[in-house]
Amino acid sequence: MINLVTVCGHNTTMLKHMLSHYKDIVDDIFVVVYLSTDKDKVLFEVTEITKDLNIDIHKTSIEEPFNWTRVTELYNETKLLKPDDWWIVSDDDEFHVYPKPINELIEDCEENGYKFITGAFLDRIGKDGRFPK
């Protein structure tokens, strides 16, 4: 199985687009909402976005703002729920593009004994919101 995990916080501008980007290429999506207070408006925003896409919020966590160590812990805790599955780890402003279907990449990895795939970050969103070649 292929799962997506994202930890979203103070800005939900790209979240709907990001979740839509991955929705058809993963089996399950885990959205962790990182809040600075229990009254943080982000929870309402994320709830509306995920509801529109028929995705459940996996977890909410109230933490000090911008604690990147804690964000990493939240990613890792979530991945431990299904330790034998493949995971796409993506912030809400990251849209991974692969050279071939992700299932084929995973098959190649499993055949060759690889446990993970890394890649480079490249900002390539065009004026119309598409990914130019």
Predicted features and spans:
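Active-site-proximal specificity loops/subdomain of glycosyltransferases
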Residues: D38-S90, V97
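Conserved donor-nucleotide/metal-binding helix-loop-beta segment in metal-dependent transferases, i.e.
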Residues: Y98-G126
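Short, well-formed alpha-helical segments that are part of the catalytic scaffolds
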Residues: N11-I25
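A short acidic, amphipathic alpha-helical/loop segment
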Residues: H17-H21, E45, P101-L105
